[in-house]
From Swiss-Prot:
Organism name: Hantaan virus (strain Lee)
Entry-linked InterPro entries: Envelope_glycoprot_Hantavirus, Gc_C_bunya, Gn-B_hanta, Hanta_Gc_N, Hanta_Gn-H, ITAM_motif_hantavir-typ
Domain ITAM: 611-634
PROSITE patterns in the cross-refs: ITAM_2
UniProt protein name: Envelopment polyprotein
Amino acid sequence: MGIWKWLVMASLVWPVLTLRNVYDMKIECPHTVSFGENSVIGYVELPPMPLADTAQLVPESSCSMDNHQSLNTITKYTQVSWRGKADQSQSSQTSFETVSTEVDLKGTCVLKHKMVEESYRSRKSITCYDLSCNSTYCKPTLYMIVPIHACNMMKSCLIALGPYRVQVVYERTYCMTGVLIEGKCFVPDQSVVSIIKHGIFDIASVHIVCFFVAVKGNTYKIFEQVKKSFESTCNDTENKVQGYYICIVGGNSAPIYVPTLDDFRSMEAFTGIFRSPHGEDHDLAGEETATYSIVGPANAKVPHSASSDTLSLIAFSGIPSDSSLSILTSSTEAKHVFSPGLFPKLNHTNCDKGAIPLMWTGMIDLPGYYEAIHPCTVFCVLSGPGASCEAFSEGGIFNITYPMCLVSKQNRFRLTEQQVNFVCQRVDVDIVVYCNGQRKVILTKTLVIGQCIYTITSLFSLLPGVAHSIAVELCVPGFHGWATAALLVTFCFGWVLIPAITFIILTILKFIANIFHTSNQENRLKSVLRKIKEEFEKTKGSMVCDVCKYECETYKELKAHGVSCPQSQCPYCFTHCEPTEAAFQAHYKVCQVTHRFRDDLKKTVTPQNFTPGCYRTLNLFRYKSRCYIFTMWIFLLVLESILWAASASETPLTPVWNDNAHGVGSVPMHTDLELDFSLTSSSKYTYRRKLTNPLEEAQSIDLHIEIEEQTIGVDVHALGHWFDGRLNLKTSFHCYGACTKYEYPWHTAKCHYERDYQYETSWGCNPSDCPGVGTGCTACGLYLDRLKPVGSAYKIITIRYSRRVCVQFGEENLCKIIDMNDCFVSRHVKVCIIGTVSKFSQGDTLLFFGPLEGGGLIFKHWCTSTCQFGDPGDIMSPRDKGFLCPEFPGSFRKKCNFATTPICEYDGNMVSGYKKVMATIDSFQSFNTSTMHFTDERIEWKDPDGMLRDHINILVTKDIDFDNLGENPCKIGLQTSSIEGAWGSGVGFTLTCLVSLTECPTFLTSIKACDKAICYGAESVTLTRGQNTVKVSGKGGHSGSTFKCCHGEDCSQIGLHAAAPHLDKVNGISEMENSKEYDDGAPQCGIKCWFVKSGEWISGIFSGNWIVLIVLCVFLLFSLVLLSILCPVRKHKKS
């Protein structure tokens, strides 16, 4: 019945597969070619095809790299198949027979001696296939081995195998030379005693593919090593097959020859091949649950002309999961076996009538080290409505994410760096990119500035130099840019715009005055009518007509109604109307003269004399007067200059620099100085003041407190590597014999569980060809395959949050690392961390899906013992223990139907813990890391996101001996060396200062970057005696700013100009470098400071480009000429 089920399924699947017969083979390539004959390998498992078509299978390649010619030769196989005997109606050990025939297969993975080495030297590929067959259909697996140079020569190509087309895709990893495992670049090391190299020494599970190479010689007697290693009873090893396995580790390595006693990798592979000879199964997606029907044990003649049986096999029907190609062991010549529908004997405890696999795939544990992670460089340029960005890293990019950007999976490489191009569609918010675990911020405001400058320069392309000089002023973001535009427009066109705008304003005001006058007249008339009506109602009665019921406004109108309405006439137009109320009311709505009596009253009411007042004053205002225009022009220039100066600095985000004037704030010590605040984990804090004697202000002492960003240190227990795997449920049924009679392929899997239902007790659980009740066995097997390491887990034992605190109090310089509930205490200063708000706790498990620099997840519940399949931590490989398999708590059920093969059912979970976590990953807390340091027992990092907070308390005592501590002998000299970056931009500039210290060994202080009026940034630094180089970053300024290095009120003599913001690439800045709070109490910029700033700008804008002043003056003269034409001076005649 299993065969018929397989036929039905294949008949349904085959037409669908023929519609889409193109499949992908991925070959992972490192982005450098290392020394040695390294090759890369890829493979793909293809859908089933008829067994009869396998004889015509030949791989055909369209790749630019030639295929090795040796694979085009025909290999003779002994095909062993089984069939039922015609005279047998009951299943038994003698109810079937095996048949051996000779077949020719072309392109199978029969590698010759030195073939891989020759293909590397001649730049040729090796393309071959393996077959996994039952009695009816075969599933091919296509393999391709190419020299590593192909990664630089090709991106993709096409291979044909029978009805299938396989597209080979060369995919670059970010690894320099290593293998990508768990998102990290692992470099296997041949030495067992290897120590740390460039990274951390570890043991990783690496995928391996091996091919048997038949060659005669005393050094190739493989079964001699089998006998030594596995205590085999193989006595006649001289007459066994001779040769070796050649293996590729991790999809990218130099050839490994198995067995080689002095190569640890080789012996690991050798152990895997002979302890688990079936290796990884060849199940396709959807074949995790399948049924075998074991027909029975069989013997066959290999070759077909042999006089006696030489190979033991087990016949089966059902979905094939393992390779059907093997090598007979009982001959020194390689006898190739093709056994569709039969498992050859691969157990070599007894070497009689056995075989070895032609190919083997599996996993081995290898020691090695992980490649170091290099920082990223990210920059962007404006492109259309968004930004085009690139990221570089010397050692490759393992992770780059940003939800607002489109990051392509196809990466390009430039020399030894990896280049990743991506597009961000929005530039209205800053671009935050996580690259190699670093948080990079690209300030898009600078990109918009560049686009603005480009646009203005393009519009005035006749004078590009002048246009660019003006554009860099106008395109400063915020109010400052608008203030600059207003200032330039007022200077150039104020003489025309001032009278024009004044005229428009006067017109609007006169219109409003006229409206108010008319409105007042109407309101006055309404008031008179209301008073008349009230008086009439008090003396005479109602003002409503008795006939038409219309309410009249005057007595004369009421009297007209009394005469006309009884005569059926309209009192207004004397038109005939029906003598009904409704008719009169309807007529009044269309009558054109109902206001006749109101107008007569308006004429009789004496109008109030209108005094021109405001309206006349507006008419007489001399807005064309040159004196008025000049006065307003000067006033607007002064006002706009002050507003411009006040807005010449950017509004910063918190916590960063706040622009202030020169100097340091002072605090009179009447009482103790206490500061109490919270500080994010990613922020530095600098507090600087002059403490003055309240009794004598001339006496002071310098105080400088520096608190560095938080360091998170955890003592951990390395739990090992977490694996993902596929759980398979297989049913193996045979009609006779005990369950222990056969060995199934899952018996050699690392993790497996079996439940046997031995000796069927009912006819309802037996197929029709079974002998009867009380015989046979149904074996239910659960096993894990396709194991893949996905992450590393660490359990937190203890956790510590610490900061480094340094205090300069006069001459005294002290530093200490303090943690939570700890204090820095000196004679005058006390700095304490009172508490920390954190999301980590003791006992949590940290899981890293890639390099530790990329951050990870926090698990509150992680399985460490009696793990069930599906739990976090279900499949683990600790370094100090063997492979830990999960428990399968579900129960089996044997499903029976009359005259059909029993089927095993499992009611437990079939989804791995990793897949469950990935499906609900948003429900777990994550964290990012920076400045990572780690060993097996301890991990330290800094939080780039500022997700944690420390409660800080600073106390400075008022009891200070100013007489003895006031004098500070330290002398500081300043010199400005160089400047990088741009003024007025979001990214800012970096000033390089040469600072000399004399008279004392060390001194903690701050160096500022300032122009004549304002300081834009500061750097807290510990100076040592002699010359020190200090880099100070700042943001803001203007085109006239001459940036100098300053210390307090003292600045370097020579300053430097920064570049203008333009279309250059905007580099991403590290958030850890940019996150700092600086407080030195310097005063804010006042009126005097604003004027100094305006003067510096005005002198600076013209100092380098006098043509700009000439052009502006030309525009001014043009506006004066235009004013004289449009508003000529009125000539007054002398009386």
